[in-house]
C-alpha cells in the first residue's frame, strides 16, 4: 500500500503524478481553443490542425529516445529537463503571434512531453518495491486520467472568460514547482545501457516527420506540389533505409523479429489504421460544435466530458467483454459501431436534438475505449518476453503517429469541403462537416477488414485479466 512508503518516496510519486497530469491535460485542453486561436492569429479555423499535429508528431518521434536517455543520464536530470522544456514550450506558445511561431513552440513542448511519461514510469519502477509497483502506478496515473477529463472544459472556460494564452500559462507555476521539487527530492537513478541505435532513430524520425508533413503540407502549410513530392520521396526512402538497416541487426532500435509474431503484425497494422480514424474525433468534435453549430468554447468543452466519462467507465468492463466474445468479434463490432456513432453525431446536432448529444458522445467514448484496449492487448499478447519491451515501445510510437495522421487527414477533409470559407452555423459549413464526417466514418470502418483477419481466439490457455487497482490488462497462461 502507498501508506507504507517513506515521506521522500511519497513526494517523488507526487512529482511523477504532476508530470503525468501536465502531459495529459495538454493533449485535450488545446482542442477546444483552436477556433479562438485562429481568430487571434488571423488564421482560418479550418487550418489549425498543425497546432496539434506538431505536438503529437514530436512526441511520437522522441519516445524511443526517452527511456535510453533516462538510463544513461539519470531519471532526475531527464525528468527535470522534460519539465523545463515543457514549461518553456508553454511560455513560447503563450507568446506566439503567428501560427508558425505557435507550431515551433509546440515542438519544444512536445519534446518535454515525450520524455515526461515514460521517464516517470521508470522512476516509479526504481523507487518502489516490485510488489507495490501496480499500486504506485495507480496513484501516479490517476491525475493523468483526470487531465483529459478537465482539459476540454477548462480550455473552453479559459478561452471564453480570459484568453487562449492562459491554456499555456497555467502550466508555468506547476512546471516551476515540479522542476524545483525534482531537483530537491528525486534521486538521479541510472542503469547500465546498451548502445543507442542513433542511425535507426534518425531514419525513423525522418520517415515519420516527412510523410506527416507531406500529408499536411498543402492545406495546412501551403507547400508546393514539388515540395510535397520531395517530402514523400524522402520519407519513403528513410523508412526503406530503416528496414534495410534493421535487417539482421541485433542492436536495431526495433527488431524486425517483432513482425514474425502474426498477432503483433496484424495488431500493429490495424492499430495504425484504426487510430487514424479515432484520432480525428478529438479534433473534429469541438471544431464542429463551435464552427458548425455556433457553440461557445466553454459549452463545447463541457459537451466533451461525457465522451471521456464513457471512455473511463468502459475500462472497468473491457476485460469481461473481450473474454466473453473474443478479440476478433469485439474489434470488428466496435469498429463498425464507432463509425455509425460518429456519423450520427452531426446528424443529431443538425436535427436540433441537442439534449441527445451527450448520450451520443458517451457511447462514442465507450466504444472507442473498448476498441483501444482490445487493440493494445491483441498486439502484445503473443510476443515473447525478450521482445515485449521493444514491441510495447513501437506500439506507443505508432499510437502517437496515427493520431497525428488522423488530425492531418481531418484538417484536409474539412478544409477541402469548406473551401476554407467559414461562416459559422451556415448551410455551407453544415454540408462541409457532413461530407467530412461521412469520409471519417468510412476511414474508421475500414480497419474492420484488418480485424477480420485476427486469428480465432483460443481461450483455453490464455485469458485476459485485469491488474488489481488499475485499468490495465494482462494475459494469464
Swiss-Prot record:
CDD domains: MFS_LmrB_MDR_like (cd17503). InterPro entries: EmrB-like, MFS, MFS_dom, MFS_trans_sf, Multi-R_MdtD. GO terms for cellular component: plasma membrane. It is a multi-pass membrane protein. It is found in: Cell inner membrane. Keywords: Cell inner membrane, Cell membrane, Membrane, Transmembrane, Transmembrane helix, Transport. The chain crosses the membrane at residues 13-33, 50-70, 73-93, 107-127, 139-159, 166-186, 196-216, 220-240, 268-288, 291-311, 326-348, 352-374, 394-414, 432-452. Its main location: membrane. SUPFAM superfamilies: MFS general substrate transporter. One of its GO terms (molecular function) is transmembrane transporter activity. HAMAP family: MFS_MdtD (MF_01577). PANTHER family: BLR6921 PROTEIN, MAJOR FACILITATOR SUPERFAMILY MULTIDRUG TRANSPORTER MFSC. Belongs to the major facilitator superfamily. TCR/Tet family. This is Putative multidrug resistance protein MdtD. The lineage of its organism: Bacteria, Pseudomonadati, Pseudomonadota, Gammaproteobacteria, Enterobacterales. The gene is mdtD.
